[in-house]
């Protein structure tokens, strides 16, 4: 069990309210236009908060994929009905054309180098049916660039003192986030997350290289500093004819 996985699990489930996941899924389903019963997947599902929302919103057996054994185990308990597979987004353990839609919430696909992101998008394109949707939800890089440095500190009951420090490189469009937890027992956990972001033109180019088409943002308007998230609809290229 890595410190990285433990920190992600303990901080996210305390600071991310269920309503946020419910809203994320509602918007994503509205963009994907996929009927209940069709095969859908949460890529980088974590401990299953979005899977649970998918189940609650009519998709009773969504597929969740994550490479963390800890998070997959948590997702099994958190999202009854979901099917869970431990796997890497760069090599999805799925047949070609097996998904009607896929969702990736909060940058799970963009935690590595740019080449990793391209490989992951190509894998997603491979597993989507022609015309199938991929909805990406990330933080808004325009908003991050307006405040490139931030620090958060809070004493969290049952967890300890949590410190989060973030530095955003606007030139590279990369955010470096270090989270540290000091537990009541005196244990200190720390991990750094390097998250790559894409402005819409760059995301469209990356999608095109992967065999996907960038369709639109939600809302369908240019990003500004006040836009909370980047939510993008990509689509698998339709077969000719």
How should each PLM-predicted stretch be described?
Residues 1-35, 37-44:
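Conserved class I S-adenosyl-L-methionine
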Residues 47:
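Conserved SAM/SAH-binding loop
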Residues 50-91:
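Class I SAM-dependent methyltransferase SAM/SAH-binding core
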Residues 93-102:
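A short acidic, Gly/Pro-enriched loop at the edge of an enzyme's catalytic core
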Residues 118-130:
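A short glycine-rich, Lys/Arg-flanked "PGG" loop and its adjoining helix->strand segment in the class I
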Residues 135-204:
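SAM-dependent methyltransferase
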Residues 202-241:
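C-terminal lobe and adjacent flexible extensions of AdoMet/dcAdoMet transferase-like proteins
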